[in-house]
């Protein structure tokens, strides 16, 4: 265990220091590069390993060796700089299903000092347009199928091999990725100098009020994540199956950066299908899966069929994040798959992988825990009402601090000030406690995001749409528990007098305006929405009302 000040007295068991009410990580400290002009792509490429195959496309079998990967990164970066004109600080959007070339694009863009951002492929054209208006990308990497969702006249590089003529003339295609990968570099190596404090990545994190916000992550933030990833007890010869979306922080940090530095092989599924995943495990003798909790539940429910059809003897580890696993789910999985270890973790988009995780099956059997603090992370538990710092086994809002914590929100200083204080503490919005052994437990969400199958759904966005309906006076959206999805959006609606508005009409009204994962799936009508004196919706009262009928 390492501490920032020698004078601190820290309990070696819990990691807690009474003098400053701070919990410290019990893991080994990170070794970060002192060179302030070393970008994260260079840091990743400099890591020694003996890995040969970096990525495999599960659908086609196409492979990228590590030599192929770094050759492609160099060539794409050269094309972007000399032919497209991408420069330091420019924003490049990736709108694409999972692909073995997403890591190539991310690493190329960051090597130039440019910033990559992503969008959910399920989002509507309206939702994507709002994000584009905020981030103002210079260029978009996308597929022929997804290109029509983009605003007209935006520059596009196609990530598939479809011909130009199949696209509407309003879309300005400036390149095809497969051609960029084949093109020999120009030999002109002059590029903009990159500083570690420069922004490298901007992922959009949904908020409970107003529009989603672009989370700004620097080269230093991502370097800290990669350094932590390779320092964890991971086997370099692991073969991972990537089922999580690579437009999300989990997929990007793990499979576009972490495993590349580690030298592991990753088999990428373009989209998740349970039996496609199992087929990939058997075919490629995969040893590790990274999953969201609903997939774990599906594996339990279909265990007999899965084990009868597929050889999963190579599978050793399942890594699960997004929500704490219950004792019932953990025990149910271990009963069905006794030779597979479950490892859990906790992090936020704003923490870039910093948070907590379990690194052994024994730790994961401490039911409900997200693990112990990751390397170089400090934590505080704060009373959300008084602001008082709490101690061991006391519940309050979790604050995190460390080298991977985001710089803040893009063009939103107010939100940045509310979330990250002047000392660099990230207020997570999650109600947690840390026990006498330093294990973090997530009790509840102070933040009101609904997590549907790993996707974040902001209630305020759906409420804003609901009240535009001519027959709706007021509305509130809450998370409704579901065994398969984790949660789904449920609406409480106040109808106008004499209105005969039905549940189906409300559901249909919303479904036409949002991505599939944001759809409202249950509606209840109510006389009034319970609110505080200041007008804030009392969601907990509505959640209690909804779940009391279960």
From Swiss-Prot:
Expressed at very low level in leaves. ATP binds at residues 205-209, 213, 344-345, 349, 430, 445, 536. The keyword Iron-sulfur does not apply. Its EC number is 6.2.1.-. It is an enzyme of class 6 (ligase). InterPro entries: AMP-bd_C (IPR025110), AMP-bd_C_sf (IPR045851), AMP-binding_CS (IPR020845), AMP-dep_synth/lig_dom (IPR000873), ANL_N_sf (IPR042099). It is found in: Peroxisome. CoA binds at residues 271, 453-454. One of its GO terms (cellular component) is peroxisome. One of its GO terms (molecular function) is CoA-ligase activity. Both substrate-binding domains (SBD1 and SBD2) are involved in the substrate recognition, and are sufficient to confer the substrate specificity. Contributes to jasmonic acid biosynthesis by initiating the beta-oxidative chain shortening of its precursors. Acyl-coenzyme A synthetase which exhibits a high activity specifically toward OPC-6 ((9R,13R)-1a,1b-dinor-10,11-dihydro-12-oxo-15-phytoenoate). Also capable of activating sinapic acid, a cinnamic acid derivative. Follows a two-step reaction mechanism, wherein the carboxylate substrate first undergoes adenylation by ATP, followed by a thioesterification in the presence of CoA to yield the final CoA thioester. This is OPC-6:CoA ligase. It comes from Arabidopsis thaliana.
């Amino acid at each position: 265990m390492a501490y920032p000040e020698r004078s601190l007295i820290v309990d070696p068991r819990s990691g807690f220091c009474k003098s400053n009410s701070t919990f410290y990580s019990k893991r080994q400290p990170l070794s970060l590069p002192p060179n302030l002009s070393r970008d994260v792509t260079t840091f990743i490429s400099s890591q020694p390993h003996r890995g040969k195959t970096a990525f495999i496309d599960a659908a086609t079998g196409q492979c990228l060796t590590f030599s192929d990967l770094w050759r492609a990164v160099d060539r794409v970066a050269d094309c972007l700089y000399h032919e497209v004109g991408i420069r330091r600080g420019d924003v490049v959007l990736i709108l694409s299903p999972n692909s073995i070339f997403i890591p190539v694009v991310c690493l190329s863009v960051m090597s130039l000092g440019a910033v990559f951002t992503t969008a959910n492929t399920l989002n509507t054209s309206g939702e994507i347009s709002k994000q584009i208006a905020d981030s103002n990308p210079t260029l978009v990497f996308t597929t022929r199928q997804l290109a029509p969702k983009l605003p007209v006249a935006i520059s596009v590089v196609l990530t598939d091999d479809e011909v130009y003529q199949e696209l509407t003339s309003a879309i300005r295609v400036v390149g095809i990725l497969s051609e960029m990968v084949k093109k020999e570099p120009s030999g002109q190596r002059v590029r903009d100098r990159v500083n570690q404090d420069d922004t490298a990545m901007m992922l959009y994190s949904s908020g409970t009020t107003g529009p989603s916000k672009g989370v700004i992550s620097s080269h230093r933030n991502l370097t800290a994540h990669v350094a932590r990833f390779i320092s964890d007890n991971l086997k370099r010869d692991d073969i991972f199956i990537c089922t999580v979306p690579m437009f999300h922080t989990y997929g990007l940090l793990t499979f576009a950066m972490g495993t590349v530095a580690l030298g592991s092989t990753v088999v990428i599924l373009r989209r998740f299908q349970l039996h496609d995943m199992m087929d990939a495990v058997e075919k490629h003798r995969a040893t590790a899966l990274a999953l969201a909790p609903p997939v774990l539940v599906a594996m339990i429910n279909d265990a007999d069929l899965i084990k009868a059809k597929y050889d999963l003897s190579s599978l050793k580890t399942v890594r699960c994040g997004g929500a704490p696993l219950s004792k019932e789910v953990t025990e149910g999985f271990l009963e069905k798959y006794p030779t597979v270890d479950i490892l859990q973790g906790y992090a936020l988009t704003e923490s870039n992988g910093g948070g907590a995780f379990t690194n052994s099956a024994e730790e994961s059997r401490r039911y409900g825990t997200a693990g112990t603090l990751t390397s170089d992370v400090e934590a505080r538990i704060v009373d959300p009402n008084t602001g008082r710092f709490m101690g061991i086994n006391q519940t309050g809002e979790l604050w995190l601090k460390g080298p991977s914590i985001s710089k803040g929100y893009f063009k939103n200083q107010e939100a940045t000030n509310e979330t990250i204080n002047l000392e660099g503490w990230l207020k997570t919005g999650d109600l947690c406690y840390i026990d006498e052994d330093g294990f973090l437990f997530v009790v509840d969400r102070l933040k009101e995001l609904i997590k549907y199958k790993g996707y974040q759904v902001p209630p305020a966005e759906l409420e804003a749409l609901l009240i535009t309906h001519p027959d709706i006076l007021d509305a509130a959206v809450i998370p409704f528990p579901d065994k398969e999805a984790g949660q789904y959006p449920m609406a409480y609606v106040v109808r106008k007098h004499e209105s005969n508005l039905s549940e189906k009409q409300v559901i249909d009204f919303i479904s036409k305006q949002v991505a599939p994962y944001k759809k409202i799936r249950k509606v209840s009508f109510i006389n009034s929405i319970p609110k505080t004196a200041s007008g804030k919706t009392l969601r907990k009262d509505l959640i209690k009302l909804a779940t009391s009928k279960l």
